[in-house]
Amino acid sequence: TRTDHPSGSDRVFEAIETIDPDRRFTQILNLQGDLPDLSPEIPHLLGATLDRGETDLATLVTPASAEEAARPQVVKAVVSWQDADFGTALYFSRAAIPTGTTALFHHIGVYGWRRDALARFVALPPSPLEQAEKLEQLRALEAGMTIAIGKIDTAPGGIDTAEDLEAARMRAAAAHHKD
């Protein structure tokens, strides 16, 4: 794909248009390379969240620890919950929001897109909030798109810093030596 895309979702759209010009696939899952510990259940839950309601795209969250809440590399999601495991996104931020006694949720950077919604998304320029927070999903929210949220128990290990990369290498080496 081109190297000048403003977001991963823009890159995914280019890839799916190249791979599937006949548009056989109507849903696209965008799984991030910086989440090497993604469990096999994640794509299934992401697809189920996308299928659950009238929504443009879906993503996942998990309860945030106090340490995660304080880290700007951990994106927090504000969610309007419809039940214990399903809701709609209201906002995403690198800040610890919402304040108060409400539980904080760690956004997992995976997306399930309806193909038509992804096409609408990539036709939009990066939005002011997207540029301020450096979070692509804010472009969708600012455009009035609906983001369904599924809840998982724990976050997969992500790589946001050099320390995260070293920890991932150690996990991979330990797993390799088990085999």
Annotate each predicted stretch with a short phrase.
Residues 4-9, 66-67, 156-158:
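A short acidic, often aromatic-flanked loop/helix-cap motif at beta-alpha or helix-coil junctions
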Residues 38-127:
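Conserved core of the sugar-phosphate nucleotidyltransferase
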Residues 30-32, 60-61:
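Short beta-strand segments
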Residues 17-21, 51, 173:
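Residue-level signal for alpha-helix termini/capping positions
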Residues 102-179:
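Conserved alpha/beta core of the MobA/IspD/sugar-nucleotide pyrophosphorylase nucleotidyltransferase superfamily
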Residues 1-7, 72-74, 169:
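One-carbon transfer enzymes
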Residues 1-31, 37-45:
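Short phosphate-binding loop-to-helix
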Residues 23-25, 52-56, 145:
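Short, high-confidence coil segments that cap the C-terminus of an alpha-helix
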